[in-house]
Amino acid sequence: MRSIIALMRQREYFVQAIRRTTCVASPALNQTNFQASSFLTTLISSKKSPEETCIGSEEEEEEPNKCLSLRIEKLPKGVTVGSALQSWMGDGFPVHGGDVYHAINRLRKLGRNKRALELMEWIIRERPYRLGELEYSYLLEFTVKLHGVSQGEKLFTRVPQEFQNELLYNNLVIACLDQGVIRLALEYMKKMRELGYRTSHLVYNRLIIRNSAPGRRKLIAKDLALMKADKATPHVSTYHILMKLEANEHNIDGVLKAFDGMKKAGVEPNEVSYCILAMAHAVARLYTVAEAYTEEIEKSITGDNWSTLDILMILYGRLGKEKELARTWNVIRGFHHVRSKSYLLATEAFARVGNLDRAEELWLEMKNVKGLKETEQFNSLLSVYCKDGLIEKAIGVFREMTGNGFKPNSITYRHLALGCAKAKLMKEALKNIEMGLNLKTSKSIGSSTPWLETTLSIIECFAEKGDVENSEKLFEEVKNAKYNRYAFVYNALFKAYVKAKVYDPNLFKRMVLGGARPDAESYSLLKLVEQYKP
């Protein structure tokens, strides 16, 4: 019976392993904000996370040591992977390919490349089962990650000829791209064409990501042209990257153009496609369109994918749909393992629909069930209180945070600045902004949607006071993140000039050059500003 289960798992893990996702860390990936906190919780398409898979096996077997991956992960420093495999076999468990693929996928996700390489070296050396192309591909991948491209090339020549095939070449190209050796990667792609091998869409995904940095964006068109010339099979993940790049630039037209390109290529959109579309329109405050795409998510969702459900909670919160939000949260709560992140998203979503009591209940439930382990957990409740100007409650959370030994970060102070501004404590708001600026804030945080929306709310508070100077200072922040492409962002700034009764002849020009389309409110505010012309 165990052999049958193992064979079924092996097939499943083999398929997952072939579809190596673009979530593997690379410098360019981080530069373009492909992170949970920035916009979209995740772009993975698997129905269960590796953590859930292992937790499931623990429950089944009643003993965590019956999961090979966990045995390897729990090895003390200095103890070899070989010893874990020997003890595994000593307990009567055969080493199956499925167990190895699962372990490799988890080790990759955890960034434990050295352990992954140890595992593959042992598998190649001891040959506990019949080896295939995937084992050599894994060996090549982690050799390059730890020892560089030159060692990877040497290893490639020593791989048995029958396995120097399409998969291995694709992995070598991807490894070169991950190491930033683009010219060498292109040379290997040329060799693949000569050998008649197809280039995987994952290679082009990497090329697009490498060229997504500022100053290199024009090269993406060449990557797509090369992909077409190579007759590579279009893949949904490629279009997701293109859509996400445009969404991060707050370019709704660009997102829709990439989506249209997907449909023209005959690629079927999935739940992730609609998640990106719905979130992009929700952030742009185009709620009717966002609601339509949210309905498409509901129609296309496959199984209980926690990442999609997290996105649905965010969307229902923004759309004010409390009933649907509660339904989605009940589905998530039914999982064996509920992440702290899901609790935080639910807390913020219920607060958005106006149910503060429920938001507080969920945060306390998370505190009791998951424990308080990081500043982000406190920041979540802080954001809830500060958006409503409940500064006394926010101060209570801040004291609990520092009292438990957690250090406030720039996000903490940005939330407190908003809370003070909402409570009309403008001097204190400025002090908190200054304290946050004295702390390091990563580019990904500074350009994330929650940060930008909080900053815009502070601008609106200063605008109500007619404080043009501080409104302009904060506006510069959102401008650098290209959040100023929305008319409502400029409208907030224009209100500061109206309240201050100050004339500026360049406001309309700034708006147009900033990439925003004036709406009816923009024109009305600009007419009011003109009244103060000297």
UniProtKB/Swiss-Prot annotation:
Its main location: mitochondrion. It is found in: Mitochondrion. Residues 1-20 form a transit peptide. Pfam families: PPR, PPR_2. Keywords: Mitochondrion, Repeat, Transit peptide. InterPro entries: Pentatricopeptide_rpt, TPR-like_helical_dom_sf. Disulfide bonds: none annotated. GO terms for molecular function: mRNA binding. Belongs to the PPR family. P subfamily. This is Pentatricopeptide repeat-containing protein At1g07590, mitochondrial.
